Amino acid sequence: MRFMLSFQMPTERANALIKEGTFAQTMQSIMEDIKPEAVYFTNLDGARGGIFFINMDDASELPGMVEPLFHALDAPIKLQLVMTPEDLQKGTPALEQAAQKYG
């Protein structure tokens, strides 16, 4: 299943990595470990942040996806299940059944 993993980089921690000259290396290492399908960097709620689109086949993969962000960046995270257009099309019969039953 695909998830959108958004994270904030606390200013103090990110600034320290930048001053040490290890910020880019740290981010590269995290991305190599997590292997996101897509990556975007932005601001989130006024802080440096990023969005990784990740794929997990099993819930046991979750620690490997989030712990690098917790340990390296002290990053608060949010996970949100996302679908591709193909996923939505595949799920449309269940959507229609629910609408008929509960709508």
Question: What is the role of each PLM region?
Answer:
Residues 1-103:
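Conserved, structured core segments of small domains
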